[in-house]
Amino acid sequence: VRNGSDYGREIMDGFLLAQPGGVVRTSGVRRAFDEARGAADALRDGAGLIVGALAFDPRRPAALCEPERAEHTAGPWRPAALPPLPEVRVITEIPSAAEHIARVTKLVEQLSDTAQPLRKVVAARSLLAAADGPLDPVVVAGHLLARHPRANVFAVDLTPAGRPGATLVGATPEVLVARYGETVTLRPLAGTAPRHPDPDIDAERSRELLSSTKNRAEHAFVIDWIRDRLGPVCAELTVPDGPELINTSEVWHLATPIRGRLRDPGTTALDLAMLLHPTPAVCGTPTDLALETIVEAEEDRGFYGGAVGWCDARGDGEWVVAIRCAELSADGHGVRAFGGGGIVAASDPRTELDETTAKLRTLLGGLHCELPG
């Protein structure tokens, strides 16, 4: 557990989640949990707040805690003047661009076989980078917020997961689930197209995405799965007939706003996060088979594609999807940034590589780090 008085260090034995509508930041650790069920039980036994992150693979250790101190403020985070970041340089790609294309090509061949049950797999890659000086996670989060003011920006200490001093930082556009009282809201994203600096080309890309049979099918996998998961726990569930467009500075997304009313008011935000994670948007369809395919084919994703959030004693809380993120090493010099994309039978491997590159720019841009090539 880290402590200190320099900028931001005081909370990095805890948690920061800065959303457009509010900020939760904590310090100190009263109890740590490496398993989500234990944290959920602690809430029912009187814990006032649980914060942290769930790993991509639910079988891997989580990084959750009941903090000693917490502050929840309304409105956007407005950090003090940010110090400059040290220079960050990309060292290597895991896998290489050519290897990622080969992986996607193999997946497309597998998915094209209608005799097998797999319908979608999210393929990810990562970049390893090195910083000339130590990166402060909260300063990194502040720079990400400055670049992506509409994003959900986070910094989470991964010590409870057996990663002493390592931190997950990111700026995600996607809320996994929010629960306030009996009301549940979420806005899953699936289907992506890179932005273009020319407004006319950019608008055309958005129109092509909205009308894309491939991307709408990929999005439908996610929505149908969420409807099936939430149906048993919601007395009412409102799902629009089709997706809408949202954008970040790097990409266009297909998004569907979903709203529900819980059957049991004892179902907490953490319960819902555990129920929904990982969605087909970060894993695939069917989920269990896609998860095994990813575990066999890729390097360990750690907390990329996981979930970051909080849940209070009333059961209220918000959890975001841990995309557009990176893990920082304990000494602050090492960075591993991630990007992925959903693969279906109609996917084009080169286009999928371009999509991961566009997503990686979200995080690396916040570090003022350029992608090679």
Named regions from a protein language model:
Residues P257-G373:
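Conserved hydrophobic core element of enzyme catalytic domains
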Residues V1-A62:
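A generic N-terminal leader/anchor concept
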